[in-house]
Curated annotation (Swiss-Prot):
Family, per entry: Belongs to the insulin family.
Protein name: Bombyxin A-5
SMART domains listed in its UniProt record: IlGF
Record PTM Pyrrolidone carboxylic acid, positions in chain: 20
Keyword Ribosomal protein listed: no
Keyword annotations of the record: Cleavage on pair of basic residues, Disulfide bond, Hormone, Pyrrolidone carboxylic acid, Secreted, Signal
Keyword Disulfide bond: yes
Covalent S-S links between cysteines: 29-79, 41-92, 78-83
């Protein structure tokens, strides 16, 4: 019985994995990165906010915490390495 359950679980896993589409990754740099991000954010209905909109929201107490953090950005994620559309959308 356990063997039958193990085989059924294995077959289900293989069938599920074969239906999953791998995400296509591309490298986006410079103008191509900016244009692609703008198009994706616009299609998703997200307006990119400027830093000025957040200037008054507790920036005095946030500054000490942000200085020591790793400052990876979209260029690190999508220009230096290939990235997926999901990664680009996370920057909208």
């Amino acid at each position: 019985m356990k063997l039958l359950l193990a085989i059924a679980l294995m077959l289900t896993t293989v069938m599920w994995a074969s239906t999953q589409q791998p995400q296509t990754v591309h490298t986006y740099c410079g103008h191509h990165l900016a244009r692609t991000l703008a198009d994706l954010c616009w299609e998703a209905g997200v307006d990119k906010r400027s830093d000025a909109q957040f200037a008054s929201y507790g920036s005095a107490w946030l500054m000490p915490y942000s200085e020591g953090r790793d400052q990876r950005g979209i260029v690190d994620e999508c220009c230096l390495r290939p990235c997926s559309v999901d990664v680009l959308l996370s920057y909208c």
